[in-house]
UniProtKB/Swiss-Prot annotation:
It comes from Arabidopsis thaliana. Residues 677-686 have a biased composition (Basic and acidic residues). It holds the Pfam family ubiquitin. GO terms for biological process: mRNA cis splicing, via spliceosome; mRNA splicing, via spliceosome. Residues 707-782 form the Ubiquitin-like domain. Residues 1-42, 124-175, 522-554, 639-713 are annotated as: Disordered. InterPro entries: SF3A1, SF3A1_dom, SF3As1_ubi, Surp, SWAP/Surp_sf, Ubiquitin-like_dom, Ubiquitin-like_domsf. SURP motif repeats lie at residues 71-113, 193-235. GO terms for cellular component: U2-type spliceosomal complex. The keyword Heme does not apply. Gene3D superfamilies: Phosphatidylinositol 3-kinase Catalytic Subunit, Chain A, domain 1, Surp module. The modification N-acetylmethionine is found at residue 1. This is Probable splicing factor 3A subunit 1. Signal peptide: none annotated.
Amino acid sequence: MFSSMQILPLEAPPTDGKLGPLPPSQLTDQEVEERELQAEQNNSNLAPPAAVATHTRTIGIIHPPPDIRTIVEKTAQFVSKNGLEFEKRIIVSNEKNAKFNFLKSSDPYHAFYQHKLTEYRAQNKDGAQGTDDSDGTTDPQLDTGAADESEAGDTQPDLQAQFRIPSKPLEAPEPEKYTVRLPEGITGEELDIIKLTAQFVARNGKSFLTGLSNRENNNPQFHFMKPTHSMFTFFTSLVDAYSEVLMPPKDLKEKLRKSAADLTTVLERCLHRLEWDRSQEQQKKKEEDEKELERVQMAMIDWHDFVVVESIDFADEEDEELPPPMTLDEVIRRSKASAMEEDEIVEPGKEVEMEMDEEEVKLVAEGMRAANLEENVKIENVHDEEAPMRIVKNWKRPEDRIPTERDPTKVVISPITGELIPINEMSEHMRISLIDPKFKEQKDRMFAKIRETTLAQDDEIAKNIVGLARLRPDIFGTTEEEVSNAVKAEIEKKKDEQPKQVIWDGHTGSIGRTANQALSQNANGEEQGDGVYGDPNSFPGPAALPPPRPGVPIVRPLPPPPNLALNLPRPPPSAQYPGAPRPLGVPMMQPMHQQHQLTMPGPPGHPQMMMNRPPQMQPGMHVPPPPGSQFAHHMQIPRPYGQLPPSAMGMMQPPPMPGMAPPPPPEEAPPPLPEEPEAKRQKFDESALVPEDQFLAQHPGPATIRVSKPNENDGQFMEITVQSLSENVGSLKEKIAGEIQIPANKQKLSGKAGFLKDNMSLAHYNVGAGEILTLSLRERGGRKR
């Protein structure tokens, strides 16, 4: 069968691989148009660039300004992809648009447009040729273009390029774990020291490295362990390599077995690493060549060689139709709106550019601009609308609101400014305060400038208004506030009219001075009452005590310590009745040995009262308390009973009327006055205290301790609960500071054992549950008490 068939001879393909152009009958319409465009391009390449008739020397391509250049490049890109029909459509649709005059051959920018069009067409053909080569087919039109390029460049194309297998992208090989490159300039001794140290660090860990660096800190041979040293990187690389050797990965043995069985894998790894190194070197060399080429091109540019193409004159009336400039708020608002739109609206991709022509792009841009303006107008209207009025009920003034809102346990003192800062705002306060180390100086300088100004600041205005509101409740307040302010003012006025009390400071040396002050003050008070005969207060005798306040315990004067005598005048040995008038200059107090023999006759029907008791004193007269007492700062020391003012010396009072009985003596008489003053305060005998361990065993568990507040005579106490009596006095002061806002270092606690030290426990001083401690303030710079 095969022998009867005729075998026709076929021509062998040419050696250059080019089969020649296809006949016109086999071409499609698109290929025909492309062939025509190719012919026009070849003609344009052969023809010299169009010259523009000017008055100066002949010039080549004129580059348009940036805005027109963008339109030219976009148009050339679309025309190179879609053909000349697209260019004709653009000319028809934008006939009256001056921006598209570059499409006319008489325009000076037409040469630049033709240049860009040729450039984009060449790029498209290069891409199409690469695609055809990968598919194994050849386009005769592209072959013609390639031949032209080869003729222009006098280079022979590579015919075997289409038959080569495309190279795969190289992947980075595994990092070299066991290879460390030696740095330049290292000596043999330094290398040995670094290697030995790296071996010990890899074996013993980071603790060995830390200890060695601390011990050999001043040794220059071990400075390579410092991160700032040039050999530190080499040292750490050695440590990592030795660590990999001492602790290899689990799959290392399996890899070694495979490599020993098949040496081809080892050779492939070596070749792969070689190719990778070559590619890295080539890439590095290419980058260097590009930088050098760019530098040479920049150096070849003559920056002083330019030609004035056209000069534009701006008339003064051209800016009349322009909108007024935007304010800063409008610019910020528009930038925020555009940023939000960029986040919400997806940027149109390059796929849309293929389907939209220049006119459609313009319409879309104008629509977007109009939408932005409408949104900006809406935003301005929203901002211009006033917020609705809000009515607040149960409103309180800021000064009344502060005590309820401020919690002393959640406020700390700033170490920089000394202000009270909430705990939750302390970190931000410290961050702001530490931004500038001269913050305090700048703040003081700013306040100094503020003081020099004549205008008050906002804070001062607010304070002035608050003060005015307090002084004028008839304007800013209610009737109740006005009445309460009037009552307070009357009370303060009465307090100012009352004479100041003479207070004994508790020292033995100041007893006489304090007594003389009290005598002179009471003498001035009696001068006003001597003329009133019917006043019962003008008669000698015990004065009526003021009624005690409800809820306040009666405080009786304490007797002075033994052997303590006031510097008072001694009475002469003469007897007088307690209620009878006395001669001037004669005191009522008598020696003890004479008063035991006196009796007081009374009216008929009344029993005689014996005078064998200690000398009586007026209830209104208070004996100075012992040193350290809690009443030392609050008691008054008037003149003793029977002492007359100096102004009344030499005058005699009339005898009492017959039938009048002297007032009865007080129910309780104070003890006799001491004879000799005490030189030193007596100390509390600590041996009388129960030992601390025994006291803790008797009083286990938490306890409540009562502490009297300073400068308060209404008998108020605050109760402090401690978890155990083993707590020291300092912790108790901290709890007190949280209650009354007095720093612990300003507090002074005293009890039955005297003043309490901060480092001692409560059980040491036998302070139990329910015991009352006296709180006073520690004074700086005063005399030691």
